[in-house]
Amino acid sequence: VETKADLVVVGAGPAGSAAAAWAARAGNDVLVIDSASFPRDKPCGDGLTPRAVAECERLGLGDWLDTRIRHRGLRMSGFGGEVEVGWPGPSFPSTGSAVARLELDDRIRKVAEDSGARMMLGTKAVAVHHDSSRRVVSLTLADGTEVGCRQLIVADGARSSLGRELGRRWHQETVYGVAARGYLATARADDPWLTSHLELRGPDGSKDKVLPGYGWIFPLGNGEVNIGVGALSTSKRPADLALRPLINYYTDLRRDEWGFDGPPRAVSSALLPMGGAVSGVAGPNWMLIGDAAACVNPLNGEGIDYGMETGRLAAELLDCRDLSRVWPALLQEHYGRGFSIARRLALLLTFQRFLPTTGPIAMRSPRLMTIAVRVMANLVTDDDADWVARAWRGAGRLSRLVDRRVPFS
């Protein structure tokens, strides 16, 4: 073994870097391994909900985030209406933000580095090695280097090749997301609202069909917006759409309104396991976090907040002797109810008539849309005592009782 550390973190995105920062601050010897060299891009909407802002502030990035754009809430359009809803929920900051992942991820990674974590970038972990008790004792990198570890956190993203090596399985009978995004210059890049178009239709022959997803325009405050389209899918009802023609069509629909010139640049797409739809998230001395553990909100595709949260929670468990049951149980405690009911609601959106029937009713009620924004962004905590929070938690408990497969199992 050429290199070793108390804790090896595979993946230097928001989840891995947050875990590394918290673990290093607690006095652990931490090594972060990532196949990419930073800064690097990542397909994402770049939006930060108040939940994500809270986690950035907890990590010490509040002052840095104050130098970036702040958003008041969501502007939602579709079905003949438009409504602006300020970020609701008493337990989180009153503003969100949006920062390109090229910049955000490297900034969070530097927090981990400044906290004492070592970095091995531009090299991929390709294999894990166990002892007789199934504890991971070392990893092999693509260049043949052996890295020894006492504990391992896997944060290598939605496809999680190392997670598959450890036995992770993705269950596609619940909803997952497909999305594409790009960037466009506009004079409206400082607009203080994240814009979502809920009546998403495709080009050509599919114009008469509302797709199970939404289009978005997220101002970045730097002269550009992140523009994208996303749709929900299941193994039984796959989203039958070509993302690049769809994002180009969506851009053309919004061109005059936003003053866009030309096609989006840097278009890239992603596949998103959601709502804890994976099993095999832990072993005796290892844990999957963030996108690798399908910690993505099924109702809005948001994953940065859950990534940073699970990184912090994982770092708090490093003294645990056996994580095999402790980590899945903790994930279920924190996210099980919310993910279960969100998966169920998102599944309804994949039925062709659901959105055209309910969308016009919801858009006519600002109060209903305020509730929708709050639960869609999961701006509900166990400490919130209002009726919306109680109803959401109760619905989550009922939903879990009838789940064929509960989240993270």
Features from the language model and the residues they span:
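Redox-cofactor binding/interface segments in oxidoreductases and associated redox assembly factors
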Residues: 10, 154-155, 288
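Beta1/beta-strand and adjacent pyrophosphate-binding region of the FAD-binding site
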Residues: 1-15
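A conserved beta-strand/loop capping segment in the N-terminal third of enzymes
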Residues: 53, 57-107
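FAD/FMN-dependent oxidoreductases across multiple families
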Residues: 235-318, 325-326
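C-terminal helical "tail/cap" subdomain of flavin- and related membrane-associated enzymes
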Residues: 316-409
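Predominantly flavin-linked oxidoreductase catalytic cores and closely associated redox partners
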Residues: 111-260
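Conserved Rossmann-like nucleotide-cofactor binding loop
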Residues: 15, 38, 159
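Glycine-rich FAD pyrophosphate-binding loop
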Residues: 8, 24-44
